[in-house]
Amino acid sequence: MDLLSSLPDEVRCLILSFLTTKESASTSVLSKKWRNLFALVPNLDFDDSEFLHPEEGKRERDGILQSFMDFVDRVLSLQGNSSIRKFSLKCETGVPPARVNRWLCEVLQRDVSDIDLTIDLGYGYYLPEELFVSETLVNLKLKSAFNIDWWPGAEGTSLPMLKSLCVYGVRVFCDDELQELLPCFPVLEELQMSNMQWLDSDETVSSATLTTLHITGIRSENPKSISFDTPNLLSFVYTDFVAEDYPLVNMKNLSLARLALRANDDQIKRVRGPSNDLLEYDVVRHFGNVVKLMNGIQNVQELHLCPDTLELLSVCCESMPVFNNVKKLLIYSDEDRGWQAVPVLLRNCPRLETLIFEGIVHHVTDKCGDACDCIFRKDKGRSLKSCPVKVVEINGFGVTMKEKYLIEHFLDYFSCLKEMKIYINCEEDGVTQQVMKNREVSKLVLDEMEEYNEFYSCNVKLFLCKKKSIPQ
């Protein structure tokens, strides 16, 4: 008897659970004992790429797609009515939607707790109604390269055990507002919605159980109001057009927040101009209410701000709250967006330890303050001197004189700085990479870094990295 066959059934079943379903199913040919054991494997993972790839054009061969569907049918049949813990399905267009729904209904009848679907079945596909009345479902993840009209509405929905809901699509639709959706999931802890089409211009996200909320909204205009009543939230990632108002923001226990508030170029232009030039009905007049959102997240420990967000915060610098708990601040920069809010952010984070820049090239305005050296001013470096930051990390360094001057500005005025990490932008075929291939230039850059270490008490390190990516 081989070593594996001599192991207890519980151990062999555990081993099978770490294999793909295709690999696990192949053990059933060894003996009847292995076949019976496979029927008890609680995790099923079906991926059509194992049948249809990597050979180019293999999908089009007669019978290949059919063999995948037959394999899923055989496995489900072989397992009989045994319980399923996790069901993962990845399949592209070509599998009939009715067949996919039949598989889903079968695993739902077998008390599945975790469903992970990556299904590109084309437009007009609807998930089975049975998926929304499960008494055992705990985790549900949906992903598609098409639009997802994923939820039929609050009426008839009952998922009392659901703790994690993640939906990713080109465009995600809901037939009801979020305030109607969330009560259907009374113990939900994680909600992630990518490219969600908001149903209304006034929305409220209210849940006492949510700890993770990641939303990317899609709309053509600024919403009237968005409220968040989520007192136990720990992680908040929010991308959407800036709202005219944030009446309620309750996030007292927040650990991480990343804000990507959007505004179009014309709105940004008006934000930079005098407020008395704005027309009475101009939506930009209400952008100052973004301070209500900042007040609601002021207990956060790690804060990420994207380029548009920085510009929008410039309209509420005078009323910006103090972030007493922020120890890590990450700033995404863009050459078309300004740093007007950076000085007040540095002053209002009295316990800041780590400051990360995803790029330091930004739009220069006369309101950038003393955070940069783009414009000469008498109070140069004031906000930097009072900042307690110990570590500065700069990603996407393009080896330009403008960037080097700004790095020296940081070294001159961050009085508590102990370490600076600089990551060169090394995008393939990029200008920076071509420059660094020049031995004389690369030697000059390295020599400058050595001079920094000799002249400043701060430890300056130079690394290579991929091109910075700015969240949209």
From Swiss-Prot:
User: What residues does the F-box domain cover?
Assistant: 1-49
Disulfide bonds listed in the record: none
The transmembrane segments are none
GO BP terms, alphabetized: defense response
Enumerate the CDD domains for this protein.
F-box_AtFBL13-like
Which PROSITE patterns does UniProt cross-reference here?
A: FBOX
Q: What is this protein called?
A: F-box protein At3g03040
Species this chain originates from: Arabidopsis thaliana (Mouse-ear cress)
